[in-house]
């Protein structure tokens, strides 16, 4: 009977050691998973920073800085405004003369709709 009790005790002790080993293995697996996740996150962050640096270099190379863009827009705007001012100065007198002609030189004539209506009804002979 003592050997049975001793055998049971050995089985229980072996089962306890097996459960402890399984728990330790689970803890190690969980730790490795966390570490792998942290390493992957660090790698993703490093790649993201690398791509942002490449984009900024590309943007700098092909687009220039914001100040360059701003000064180019300002120059273009000033050029367009000066062109418009020259156009106004060159055409100002002709526009004034044309407006005065239209306002002062009145040529009374019938409206074309009235003329058409009279032609259709036969009341007007041209």
From Swiss-Prot:
Q: Would you tell me the Gene Ontology cellular component terms?
A: presynapse; vacuolar proton-transporting V-type ATPase complex; vacuolar proton-transporting V-type ATPase, V1 domain
Q: What is this protein called?
A: Probable V-type proton ATPase subunit G
Gene knockout outcome: Suppression of necrotic cell death. RNAi-mediated knockdown results in increased germ cell corpse number due to delayed clearance of dying or dead cells, impaired phagosome maturation at a late stage and impaired acidification of phagosomes containing cell corpses.
PANTHER family found in the cross-reference section: V-TYPE PROTON ATPASE SUBUNIT G (PTHR12713:SF11), VACUOLAR ATP SYNTHASE SUBUNIT G (PTHR12713)
Family in the record: Belongs to the V-ATPase G subunit family.
* One GO term of the biological process aspect: synaptic vesicle lumen acidification
Record text on subunit structure and interactions: V-ATPase is a heteromultimeric enzyme made up of two complexes: the ATP-hydrolytic V1 complex and the proton translocation V0 complex. The V1 complex consists of three catalytic AB heterodimers that form a heterohexamer, three peripheral stalks each consisting of EG heterodimers, one central rotor including subunits D and F, and the regulatory subunits C and H. The proton translocation complex V0 consists of the proton transport subunit a, a ring of proteolipid subunits c9c'', rotary subunit d, subunits e and f, and the accessory subunits vah-19/Ac45 and vah-20/PRR. Interacts with ced-1.
Q: Which UniProt keywords apply?
A: Hydrogen ion transport, Ion transport, Transport
Query: What domain of life does the native source organism fall in?
Result: Eukaryota
The protein's matches in InterPro entries, at most eight in alphabetical order, are given as: V-ATPase_G
Q: Function of this protein?
A: Subunit of the V1 complex of vacuolar(H+)-ATPase (V-ATPase), a multisubunit enzyme composed of a peripheral complex (V1) that hydrolyzes ATP and a membrane integral complex (V0) that translocates protons. V-ATPase is responsible for acidifying and maintaining the pH of intracellular compartments and in some cell types, is targeted to the plasma membrane, where it is responsible for acidifying the extracellular environment. In neurons, required for necrotic cell death by promoting intracellular acidification.
Q: Name one GO molecular function term.
A: proton transmembrane transporter activity
Q: Does the keyword Transport apply?
A: yes
């Amino acid at each position: 009977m003592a050997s049975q009790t001793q055998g049971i005790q050995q089985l229980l002790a072996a089962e306890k050691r097996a459960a402890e080993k399984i728990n330790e293995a689970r803890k190690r697996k969980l730790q490795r998973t966390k570490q792998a996740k942290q390493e992957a996150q660090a790698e993703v962050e490093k790649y993201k920073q690398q791509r942002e640096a490449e984009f900024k270099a590309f943007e700098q190379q092909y687009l220039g800085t914001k100040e360059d863009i701003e000064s180019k827009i300002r120059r273009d705007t000033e050029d367009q405004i000066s062109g418009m001012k020259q156009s106004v100065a060159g055409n100002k007198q002709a526009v004034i003369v044309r407006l005065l002609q239209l306002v002062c030189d009145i040529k009374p004539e019938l409206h074309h709709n009235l003329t058409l209506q009279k032609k259709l009804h036969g009341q007007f002979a041209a």
